[in-house]
């Protein structure tokens, strides 16, 4: 079904046409920001059921779970709920009003009415958010997997919005089940904003402190830097899925629209392949132009195929409000895509390997090499801008997560070029613009290094820093968040949170050829341990769902970017804590 040049390039490993198990066989979209606000306000339909506006926060979160399940079954990428604290607050307000009326009817002392209603509402909020977390982790889509879900929150300042934020974090801190395992979904994305929660004087600073504590224990939430994200993408919004960002967009009435928009798919270039085929920088640039032309064909084909969908193919998306507008049964789905309302993504992988080919493996401090890699992303950006103006869709540059592609591209190039030091011999390619995981820059050095790329890769990006166990030192993590605020738009925390339920060890499990094992008792049974690693933008359980060999090698190679000496008082909590992380 693919154009011949595109199919050949995919098979050869020059590029990767993502999600071939769904597209182009079906005209499906990738990821989206679901328009929960409008669906809740106006009501919606799922199957044969007409669903009215919720009358409580418990009903709202139950409806949210059903919408997520239906949306995830109608597309192949992640689905996100943006500003969930603000979206759910009106329905928690209904809880408060109900409890206040109950207090007025039954409690003679009027001074107790507000306190009674507030306490009951807080309990309702916690229960609702806990139910949502359990619902998402026990749902299965028609594809047979848990929906890849992201919740964005953190900007609301009313007492109800603050309580929703607090409940989301407390539920995550509490864990799942009797063993209190770390929940993989939903991905939590906490918004930092100057004047709201960034500094101790800000009204929501206490929520930020709770978010930091949650990240030290559960890795999530990742954090969005409000001002920087607006600078990079043109407006503020949560990512679709793990890292795909919509660009600022205003409708014909001048209204900014984020919820209800979507991405139409990804095609990723194998940049190390181009470098390995080139003897000089000039040859690299010439080869890149040829590969970009094939990528353009692939992306245009994705668009044309998705446009063939009919609204009745995915009613929840096109007819019942998830995509922000309600089309007729036979309407044109392109009305929701064109005029740059939707994005289509040109991905890339392996800037580290490209520069290594021409400047050696330690090029990160070489300004000429760094400028060369930035120029590559600029070149991709220039082409996507030209394509967007030509075709009327928002072509964006996307720092591909490469959960399995890191293995596939490297494996194909190893077969073609042999073992090339620091390129194919590693068994994996570095994600997008990321610093070599084998090196040990400080978090501040890594953030400063990577900050140059997202201005040209704003269609999708994330930065990570690797830490030792930070539970006893949350202020160190907060210092990194604060440093990053004016430098990058989106930051994740990677810290050891593995648990062994046989011996009680908590920390970093040792990697082996058969997965990960407890360093103290050698346990590797997924039933009696909880191993959580950052596989790409999402967390993963590699014991329960093993990753590809290349990603496993990349995770094993990761070095900590911060060193903290464990105090003797902490060693008693951990039988294996007699070392420096």
Language-model regions: role of each:
Residues 123-133, 357, 548-556:
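Metallocofactor- and cofactor-centric catalytic cores in central/energy metabolism, strongly enriched
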Residues 577-581:
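Short, low-complexity, charge-dense intrinsically disordered segments
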Residues 86, 344-357, 378, 534:
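Contiguous, well-ordered alpha-helical segments that form the cores/surfaces of helical PPI scaffolds
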Residues 522-572:
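Long insertion/accessory domains within large nucleic-acid-processing enzymes
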Residues 271, 341-345, 533-536, 544:
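Generic secondary-structure boundary/loop-capping signal
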Residues 347-350, 459, 537, 550:
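Glycine-centered flexibility sites
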Residues 1-340, 361-362, 366-527, 531:
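Conserved catalytic cores of very large enzyme subunits
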């Amino acid at each position: 079904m693919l154009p011949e040049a595109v199919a050949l390039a995919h098979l050869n490993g020059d590029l990767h046409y993502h999600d071939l198990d769904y597209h182009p066989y079906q005209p499906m979209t990738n990821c989206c920001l679901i328009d929960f606000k409008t669906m809740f306000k106006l009501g919606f339909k799922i199957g044969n059921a007409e669903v009215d506006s919720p009358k409580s926060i418990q009903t709202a979160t139950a409806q949210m779970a059903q919408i997520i399940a239906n949306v995830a079954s109608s597309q192949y990428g992640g689905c996100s709920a943006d500003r969930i604290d603000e979206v759910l607050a009106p329905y928690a307000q209904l809880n408060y009003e109900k409890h206040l009326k109950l207090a007025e009817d039954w409690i003679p002392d009027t001074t107790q009415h507000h306190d009674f209603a507030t306490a009951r509402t807080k309990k309702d909020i916690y229960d609702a958010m806990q139910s949502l977390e359990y619902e998402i982790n026990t749902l299965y889509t028609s594809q047979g997997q848990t929906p890849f879900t992201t919740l964005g929150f953190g900007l609301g300042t009313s007492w109800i919005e603050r309580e929703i934020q607090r409940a989301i974090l407390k539920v995550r801190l509490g864990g799942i089940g009797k063993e209190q395992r770390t929940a993989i979904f939903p991905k939590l994305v906490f918004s930092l904003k100057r004047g709201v929660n960034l500094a101790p004087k800000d009204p929501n600073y206490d929520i930020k402190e709770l978010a930091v504590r949650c990240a030290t224990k559960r890795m999530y939430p990742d954090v969005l830097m409000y001002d920087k994200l607006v600078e990079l993408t043109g407006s503020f919004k949560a990512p679709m899925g793990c890292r795909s960002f919509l660009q600022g967009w205003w409708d014909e009435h001048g209204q900014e629209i984020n919820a209800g928009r979507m991405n139409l798919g990804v095609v990723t270039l194998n940049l190390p392949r181009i470098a390995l085929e080139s003897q000089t920088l000039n040859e690299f640039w010439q080869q890149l132009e040829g590969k970009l032309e094939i990528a353009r064909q692939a992306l245009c084909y994705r668009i044309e195929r998705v446009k063939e969908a009919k609204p009745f193919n995915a009613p929840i998306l096109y007819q019942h409000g998830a995509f922000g507008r309600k089309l007729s049964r036979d309407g044109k789905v392109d009305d929701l895509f064109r005029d740059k309302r939707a994005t289509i993504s040109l991905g890339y992988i392996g800037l580290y390997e490209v520069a290594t080919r021409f400047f050696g493996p330690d090029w990160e401090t070489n300004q000429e090499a760094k400028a060369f890699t930035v120029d590559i992303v600029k070149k991709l950006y220039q082409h996507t801008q030209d394509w967007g103006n030509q075709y009327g869709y928002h072509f964006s540059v996307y720092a591909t997560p490469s959960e399995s592609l890191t293995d596939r591209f490297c494996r194909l190039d190893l077969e073609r070029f042999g073992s090339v030091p620091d390129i194919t011999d590693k068994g994996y390619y570095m994600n997008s613009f990321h610093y070599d995981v084998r090196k040990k820059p400080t978090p501040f050095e890594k953030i400063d290094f990577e900050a140059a790329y997202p201005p040209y890769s704003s269609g999708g990006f994330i930065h990570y820093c690797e830490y030792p166990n930070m539970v006893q030192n949350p202020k160190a993590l907060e210092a990194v968040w604060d440093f990053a605020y004016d430098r990058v738009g989106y930051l994740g925390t990677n810290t050891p949170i593995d648990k062994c339920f046989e011996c009680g060890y908590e920390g970093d499990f040792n990697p082996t050829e058969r997965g990960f094992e407890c360093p103290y008792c050698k346990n590797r049974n997924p039933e009696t341990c909880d191993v959580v690693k950052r596989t790409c933008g999402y967390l993963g359980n590699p014991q329960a769902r093993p990753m590809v060999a290349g990603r496993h090698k990349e995770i094993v190679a990761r070095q900590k970017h911060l060193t903290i000496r464990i105090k003797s008082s902490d060693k008693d909590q951990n039988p294996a804590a007699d070392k420096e992380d």
